[in-house]
Amino acid sequence: LHSIYKPKTSKRKIASLKAFFHYCEFYEFIEKNPFDKIQIRFREPIILPKTIPLQTLELFLSTIYTQRQLATTPYQQKNALRDAAVIELLFATGIRISELCSLKPCDVNLNDNFVLIYGKGSKERKLQIGNANVLKTLNEYKNTFSTEIESCDHFFANQTGKPLSDQSVRRMIQKYAALAGIEQHMTP
């Protein structure tokens, strides 16, 4: 198996066989499970997360701020500000999109420059925001979107006053990556 398939595939096939023989033993189709005494360990290669090159990130952020400057209507200006705040916080802290979308106003402390994140497994972590530009953008966003933030009780809201969804943020990232001419798949 190991020479034909990748370690994850081999593990999956063996797990399926183990489950099948356990089922057969449970319903007494067989007396003894042949996998009871077999212990197989596979070494899986450690895959490091992909990073976004600094030049690409700078191009991406400059595109967002260019779009913000090009915004003419109040609606476009408001959206551009929100988009800049979302992207800046994502890249400054490295939080997951789902964590960003679930942020409550009380989780974002811009006076002490930190964000409280409730991650997977209800783990709480406090992330410091050290970049002055990010803090400035977040403060501007908070002041501009104060009504929407209060109405939906989430820090990031859309124009209708509802919490920003994961999918909206992913579309936002794709939109600005396309505008910047970045072909690399962007995930914060």
Please report, for each region that a protein language model flagged, where it lies by residue.
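Conserved catalytic core of the tyrosine transesterase superfamily
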Residues: 1-188
